[in-house]
Amino acid sequence: MPQLSLSWLGLGPVAASPWLLLLLVGGSWLLARVLAWTYTFYDNCRRLQCFPQPPKQNWFWGHQGLVTPTEEGMKTLTQLVTTYPQGFKLWLGPTFPLLILCHPDIIRPITSASAAVAPKDMIFYGFLKPWLGDGLLLSGGDKWSRHRRMLTPAFHFNILKPYMKIFNKSVNIMHDKWQRLASEGSARLDMFEHISLMTLDSLQKCVFSFESNCQEKPSEYIAAILELSAFVEKRNQQILLHTDFLYYLTPDGQRFRRACHLVHDFTDAVIQERRCTLPTQGIDDFLKNKAKSKTLDFIDVLLLSKDEDGKELSDEDIRAEADTFMFEGHDTTASGLSWVLYHLAKHPEYQEQCRQEVQELLKDREPIEIEWDDLAQLPFLTMCIKESLRLHPPVPVISRCCTQDFVLPDGRVIPKGIVCLINIIGIHYNPTVWPDPEVYDPFRFDQENIKERSPLAFIPFSAGPRNCIGQAFAMAEMKVVLALTLLHFRILPTHTEPRRKPELILRAEGGLWLRVEPLGANSQ
């Protein structure tokens, strides 16, 4: 048997057993990995010294707890952006640096990079994976590029135009409920609650052509979506439950899994029903029947989509994209609409100007509906929406992981492997970009003022190749909802100021409560 000399350890020759050799090889590999990680870590520390950082909270925990998902945390962030307008560095523990980017010039190299070069960092998005799968939100690389190309036609204005009737119908249902509640003396409403149900109602019709009546009666599917969103945000705050094994042992984890199954089963059933319809009718007859109803829903578009090689999306891919659209489409739009109504309640002069603009547009029209061509005829309402999206962007932050070194315009380098947070709120509150950033001023978005700013100064829908594919859908829905709401109601503030709560979506602690006052027929 071969002899192995371990005299350097003070031992004599010993038999070189396979297990000892395996132990030595494994130990050498582990040592090499530790040394490589240590070298990379210290090299990155050296290269990141050019990025300023606030004082650490603790030598071990670093800056954890400095910017909390609360109103106080938002104020701290605003102060940090004022102090470090070009961006800054935070440490999450002793070994995890995070770059916070909050200036248009600094984010340009990251936002313009491809999905393969600057993918989303899954630390912040991974909890959505069991629900949303490999949809546009979570996929990367070639799969993301292929899906993006195939989904783009789904958001062409010819597809979006017929959705206008759906938006009008859904908001009218919400308004009927508001009228009833106001007549019963319940004029103080949580905007998030009511608008979330309304956007989900619209989305089920636009995505699945399904009438759930969820604004008027409970819906198991809608309840599951709302529950999934809440569980993801709750888990994000519980570090000990970030491990899947531990999370799925908890009651929340088991409820999350059940809700996932319910949502997936609903989507799968719709897909299978359409798959059965297509072969019997043929594509031409299928499209003719759809033309009669004047609406091609999202599932239809996905089923008919083909890539450059003629390949279709799999059922699993279609489910992932439909579930992603339901998630992204309801929460973000509900957040955006709720905060616009809040600002218009706080600024009655702007609210009245918007109302007059809508009244002028719709005078002598019967029935009172917002049509596609009307959207371009509401310039001041659009300015008010954009200024609210600046102050309260529905998605406060997006993360990117650098798979290569990024050279910034000022010469600094972001090393490969570093996670960057493109802080949308930070950019929108940056005093070097926006004078008096905390003031609500719709005239910032007057055409003359827009010319003087970087296009990356205002990015509520992100920017670059991975920007929000559904932003035209979202803006159209927001304009319809706001125009009809201001036509029928006066929106008034309550005595308590909402406290911002930045999670995956920017919410308000305990809801965003406003008072609604029905307007008489003469006022309309």
From Swiss-Prot:
Effect of residue 446 to N: Does not affect enzyme activity
Organism of origin: Homo sapiens (Human)
GO terms classed as biological process: arachidonate metabolic process; blood coagulation; cytochrome metabolic process; fatty acid metabolic process; menaquinone catabolic process; omega-hydroxylase P450 pathway; oxylipin biosynthetic process; phylloquinone catabolic process
UniProt note on regulation of activity: Inhibition of the long-chain fatty acid omega-monooxygenase activity by 4-hydroxynonenal (4-HNE) conjugation.
EC class: oxidoreductase
Protein name, as recorded: Cytochrome P450 4F11
Membrane topology category: Single-pass membrane protein
CDD domains (alphabetical): CYP4F
Family of the protein in this entry: Belongs to the cytochrome P450 family.
GO molecular function, one term: monooxygenase activity
Cofactor(s) demanded: heme
GO cellular component, one term: endoplasmic reticulum membrane
Biological function: A cytochrome P450 monooxygenase involved in the metabolism of various endogenous substrates, including fatty acids and their oxygenated derivatives (oxylipins). Mechanistically, uses molecular oxygen inserting one oxygen atom into a substrate, and reducing the second into a water molecule, with two electrons provided by NADPH via cytochrome P450 reductase (CPR; NADPH-ferrihemoprotein reductase).
Modification 4-hydroxynonenal-conjugated histidine, positions: 261, 347
